[in-house]
């Protein structure tokens, strides 16, 4: 794959971290004419040579071999951040490193896209937002489910009110514990399975319903042995039960999957990544396979970030304030299951 030099009005992007998500973002940027890959950073010389074939992830195949001949390469994030050829920084590092690198980028006047989860605490998220606004730069968190075609179509139907009131909703996301990246099994670096996986569904609920008033969660937590699974009940003002469930609790042979069932007065929306595209089962007994966007979700996400950065516009479709709220809800889920009590904001 090549990254041709393009002229005029481009956003020059530097990608920090060439693991699974960094590699995924590189593929997407190659399809975005308004962006130019200016720099990459990774501690592994092999990856800086363009050989990403050792990369593993829970979706997709191995990494590619890329052409970095016209790209600045760094082993140190601070050096990339200081590169005057870079307009925006895409941070694909372990979660505990997000805040310091983002702060350095804002201090250098760069726009920032940071992978999910935004950070490990609500306070860290707030600090990042304050720094972005103080620098007058764009900050967006890569919550890709907001751009996933099936989730986008479901959101439009739920929020339009055309199917009536919500009766219940359940979201699943599950896989085996990652066999790559030892840091993922360290809760002080990753936050565990709740932060790695369920943050997507928590954020989607944030987009649909706002922040829950109370969270009750149960589930085993044994990160040393690759087990971190949660079933959580999120309470909202609308009163309908919302369940978020999943994590790492399966053998390595078990494939990654995500699914949801949203029941409304006028019908049920159901999606399963392995077996069923988004389908609407109407109350009148008919069913409909819904028309979806054909654009890859990662490409759509990065196109939106590039558009916002070029216009110096806050990303209202994927606000970092919502990402921070999702982090707080994830923390409440962990607090609830550890204390074996409801985390209730109404108290």
Predicted feature locations:
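Predominantly a Rossmann-like dinucleotide-binding segment in NAD(P)-dependent oxidoreductases
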Residues: 138, 145-223, 340
């Amino acid at each position: 794959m090549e990254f041709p030099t393009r002229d005029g009005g481009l956003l020059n992007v530097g990608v920090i971290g060439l693991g699974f998500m960094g590699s995924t973002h590189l593929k997407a940027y190659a399809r975005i004419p308004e962006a130019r890959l200016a720099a990459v950073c990774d501690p592994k010389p092999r990856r800086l040579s363009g050989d990403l074939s050792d990369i593993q992830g829970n979706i997709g195949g191995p990494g590619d071999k890329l052409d970095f001949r016209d790209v600045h390469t760094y082993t140190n994030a601070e050096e990339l951040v200081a590169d005057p050829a870079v307009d925006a920084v895409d941070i694909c590092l372990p979660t505990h490193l997000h805040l310091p690198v983002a702060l350095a980028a804002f201090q250098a006047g760069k726009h920032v896209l940071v992978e999910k989860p935004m950070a490990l605490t609500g306070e860290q998220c707030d600090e990042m937002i304050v720094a972005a606004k103080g620098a007058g730069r764009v900050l967006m968190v890569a919550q890709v489910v907001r751009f996933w075609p099936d989730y986008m179509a479901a959101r439009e139907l739920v929020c339009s009110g055309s199917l009536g009131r919500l009766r219940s909703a359940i979201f699943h996301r599950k896989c085996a514990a990652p066999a790559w990246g030892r840091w993922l099994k360290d809760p002080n670096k990753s936050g565990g399975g709740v932060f790695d996986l369920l943050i997507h569904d928590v954020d989607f609920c944030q987009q649909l319903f706002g922040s829950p008033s109370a969270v009750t969660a149960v589930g085993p937590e044994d990160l040393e042995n690759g087990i971190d699974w949660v079933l959580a009940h999120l309470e909202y003002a609308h009163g309908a039960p919302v369940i978020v469930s999943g994590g790492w609790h399966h053998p390595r042979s078990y494939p990654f999957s995500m699914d949801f069932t949203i029941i409304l007065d006028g019908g049920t929306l159901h999606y399963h990544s392995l077996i069923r595209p988004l389908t609407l089962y109407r109350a009148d007994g008919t069913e409909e396979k819904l028309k979806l966007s054909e654009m890859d979700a990662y490409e759509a996400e990065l196109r939106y970030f590039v558009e916002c950065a070029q216009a110096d516009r806050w990303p209202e479709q994927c606000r970092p304030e919502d990402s921070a709220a999702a982090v707080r809800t994830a923390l409440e889920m962990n607090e609830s299951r550890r204390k074996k009590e409801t985390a209730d904001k109404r108290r």
